[in-house]
């Protein structure tokens, strides 16, 4: 999956127009645990990355999420 495709899917999960490397997803209006779960599922289903909650809590940006593959 390309970075652009991943970012498009992340934007869908976060219910925003678009995201970039530097988007701090936890700072977005409406951020909630349901979106956190959606990002974890997206990582596993699309990138094959299973991230534990402790690691997820240290990730701050969308670029860092993509770098987990």
Q: How would you name each of these model-derived features?
A:
Residues 1-31, 40, 46-69:
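Phosphopantetheine-dependent thiolation modules in NRPS/PKS and related acyl-activating systems
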Residues 35:
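Two-component histidine kinase catalytic core, primarily the HATPase_c
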């Amino acid at each position: 999956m390309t970075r652009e495709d991943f970012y498009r899917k992340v934007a869908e999960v976060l219910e925003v127009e678009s995201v970039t490397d530097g988007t701090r997803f936890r700072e977005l209006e409406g951020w909630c645990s349901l979106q956190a779960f959606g990002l974890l599922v997206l990582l596993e289903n699309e990138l094959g990355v299973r991230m534990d909650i402790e690691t997820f809590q240290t990730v701050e940006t969308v670029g860092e999420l993509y770098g987990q593959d």
